[in-house]
Design a protein with these regions (language model features):
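Acetyl-CoA-dependent GNAT
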Residues: 7-11, 17-86, 91-94, 99-105, ...
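Intrinsically disordered, low-complexity coil segments
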Residues: 53-60, 142-151
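A short, glycine- and basic residue-enriched loop/turn
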Residues: 72-74, 122, 133-140, 153
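Conserved active-site alpha-helix within GNAT-family acetyltransferase domains
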Residues: 91, 116-134
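Conserved GNAT acetyl-CoA-binding A-motif
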Residues: 103-113
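Conserved catalytic-core motifs of GNAT/GCN5-like acyltransferases
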Residues: 111-114, 131-149
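Conserved catalytic core of the tyrosine transesterase superfamily
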Residues: 112-115, 150-158, 174
């Protein structure tokens, strides 16, 4: 599977916003306004990427990294949204993003938060070496099937030394 990250263009944003608002993605993220995405494209501390697959470079998702110039070396995987689930694309994207965070951005810590109800993503991140740091209990409001409630955010991270150990053990591409 050929997966490519390319900088998101302003011309991609209608598609990005529609992907965020899709019913399959909405329960797991807090959608942004278009202007927030524009800011992430323009702000030097952020990286906004469109994920493309195959020779045809078909758009399949997008990614937002924040803290790319953080003086503490703490880069956040702010958002990873895919159009299609269950094909290994999320894992492939996470692996590319880890390599980018630790090799290109020289991160000390690569972190994210994931909604507790998003068990599939939690298990993916855990299997890719991310460690649970804690939970922000009932910190996000969710509406599911018309019912209003709260979900917790799970904060996870991977440190550079943990990533390098995974590379040494052959769990990451060198």
């Amino acid at each position: 599977m050929s997966l490519r990250l390319r900088p998101t263009m302003l011309s991609d944003l209608d598609w990005v916003v529609s992907l965020e608002r899709d019913g399959a993605n909405r329960p797991f993220i807090t959608p942004w306004e278009r202007t927030q995405h524009e800011g992430a494209i323009r702000f030097p501390d952020s990286r906004h990427f469109t994920l493309e697959e195959g020779d045809a470079l078909t758009r399949i998702g997008f990614v937002i990294l924040q803290g790319c110039r953080n003086p503490n070396g703490s880069v956040e995987l702010k958002r990873l949204v895919l159009q299609s689930k269950g094909r290994g694309l999320g894992r492939a994207a996470v692996r590319q993003l880890k390599a980018m965070a630790f090799t290109q951005l020289k991160a000390h810590r690569f972190w994210l938060d994931v909604k507790a109800l998003n068990t599939r993503a939690f298990e993916l991140y855990r299997s890719e070496g991310f460690v649970e740091e804690g939970r922000l209990r009932e910190s996000v409001r969710v509406t599911t099937d018309g019912a209003d409630g709260y979900d917790s955010l799970i904060v996870m991270s991977l440190l550079d030394r943990e990533y390098q150990a995974r590379v040494a053990m052959g769990q990451e591409a060198a």
